[in-house]
Amino acid sequence: MKLDLKILDARMRDQLPAYATTGSAGLDLRACLDEPLTLKPGETALVPTGLAIHVGDPGYAALILPRSGLGHKHGIVLGNLVGLIDSDYQGQLMISTWNRGETTFVLNPMERLAQLVIVPVVQAEFNIVDDFETSERGAGGFGSTGKH
């Protein structure tokens, strides 16, 4: 798949998103900051990536996901948990960054902060019904299928 990419910050020309391994699903996104950003516990910030994408094909979307190491080691996660980039969006990719940890975290310019994953999308059409065909599960949710 070819994805249109617009470079909004010249520093990104030498650090384009790339797959780390042949099996990687995500492309690393960097914090395109001019100076270090200090996030105290509980604080959030909207961090620019210096990049804009245009997926273009309504059969695909992009997801911005956290990097596991930052979340596990430092409590740095996405403020919106998952960022959904629709196929027709053309603005800069921004990363909602939340320090859910107990200590202050300093995010340095050009540090890898999140990852971008391209996923297929199916746009559903509704079929209005009065009742559903009975299933084994029914309306059970929130642990109704048991612990194991």
UniProtKB/Swiss-Prot annotation:
InterPro entries according to UniProt: dUTPase (IPR008181), dUTPase-like (IPR029054), dUTPase-like_sf (IPR036157), dUTPase_trimeric (IPR033704)
Classification via CDD domains: trimeric_dUTPase
EC number(s) on file: 3.6.1.23
Cofactor(s), names only, from the UniProt record: Mg(2+)
Pathway membership: Pyrimidine metabolism; dUMP biosynthesis; dUMP from dCTP (dUTP route): step 2/2
Domain of life per record: Bacteria
Binding positions for substrate per the UniProt entry: 67-69, 80, 84-86, 94
Reaction catalyzed: dUTP + H2O = dUMP + diphosphate + H(+)
Keywords carried by this UniProt record: Hydrolase, Magnesium, Metal-binding, Nucleotide metabolism
Gene Ontology MF, one: dUTP diphosphatase activity
GO-annotated biological processes: dUMP biosynthetic process; dUTP catabolic process
Matching PANTHER family: DEOXYURIDINE 5'-TRIPHOSPHATE NUCLEOTIDOHYDROLASE (PTHR11241:SF0)
Similarity section: Belongs to the dUTPase family.
General function of this protein: This enzyme is involved in nucleotide metabolism: it produces dUMP, the immediate precursor of thymidine nucleotides and it decreases the intracellular concentration of dUTP so that uracil cannot be incorporated into DNA.
The protein, known as: Deoxyuridine 5'-triphosphate nucleotidohydrolase
